[in-house]
A protein has these predicted regions:
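Cytosolic regulatory regions of ion transport systems
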Residues: 1-132
Length: 132
């Protein structure tokens, strides 16, 4: 997203995690908890157009997404959720969910049936919403 000209802020509890962004990343890095409102304010949540939560944990992702959507009225909120049942529930509450479990199982199922890899967007309707 940064390379496409968007202003990007990344929040992580561990400063070492920022190494994964690569040396060319010029966005803002904030060490902190993504469900802490003071940290979110420092990151500019009050004026952001899109909020994406992609930690390793479903609970933290959904909490951060709900804070962004409900408290700060962020228009587009996207959250990575590993549990397909939870993903469906949160989607029903207006949060765009990306469920790797659903995407991967669909890809594997169809590859085993056809011998060809399909495009991931066919397995998670919310993927289409990423073109914001």
């Amino acid at each position: 997203m940064y390379h496409d000209g968007h202003n990007v802020t990344v929040i992580d509890l561990q400063s070492e995690a920022f190494r994964r962004l690569g040396s060319k990343f010029r966005g803002q890095r904030i060490i902190g908890n993504g469900i802490d409102e003071e940290v979110l304010k420092r990151a500019g949540v009050e004026k952001c157009d899109v909020f994406v939560s992609v930690t390793q944990g479903d609970n933290r992702n959904i909490m951060a997404a709900q804070i962004a959507k409900i408290v700060y009225n962020v228009k587009t909120v996207i959250s990575r959720i590993n549990d397909p049942v939870r993903a469906d529930i949160y989607r029903a509450h207006g949060i765009i969910t990306i469920c790797g479990t659903t995407i991967l199982s669909g890809l594997l199922r169809d590859f085993l049936a056809t011998g060809e890899w399909a495009i991931a967007k066919d397995y998670n309707a919310e993927y289409l919403a990423l073109n914001v």
